[in-house]
């Protein structure tokens, strides 16, 4: 494992850069970084809803990662001593189902 490389967090860093730009999205999610649902902000906190954003070029694409998600997956694989690592958003059941499809 390359410890110097492990000091970076490419996906988190990209999300933070996006958050600091204070962009108001016109796509999903509908709460518009908290502006459209103050109750959600009360429940989860401003920081949480402020980084709940849709897939876009600066944040890469989970289905076909080419930048920050790809780099983060490579760092994860390196940290666990694996050849590959893949991020999932559908929960454990979906991850296991996807894993089983790889071997078909």
What are the residue ranges of the model-derived segments?
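N-terminal glycine-rich, Lys/His-bearing helix-loop that initiates the first secondary-structure elements
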Residues: 1-52
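Conserved N-terminal alpha-helix of the aminotransferase class I/II PLP-enzyme fold
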Residues: 46-95
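N-terminal active-site wall of soluble small-molecule enzyme domains
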Residues: 98
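Conserved small/polar residues in nucleotide/adenosyl-binding loops
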Residues: 102-104
């Amino acid at each position: 494992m390359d410890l110097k490389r492990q000091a970076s967090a490419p996906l988190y860093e990209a999300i933070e850069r996006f958050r600091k730009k204070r962009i108001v999205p016109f796509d999903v999610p509908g709460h518009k970084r908290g502006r459209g649902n103050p109750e959600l902000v009360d429940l989860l906190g401003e920081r949480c809803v402020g980084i709940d954003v849709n897939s876009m070029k600066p944040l890469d694409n989970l289905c076909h990662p080419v930048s920050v998600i790809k780099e983060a997956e490579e760092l994860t694989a390196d940290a666990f001593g694996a050849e590959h690592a893949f991020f999932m958003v559908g929960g454990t059941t979906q991850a296991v189902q996807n894993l089983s499809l790889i071997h078909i």
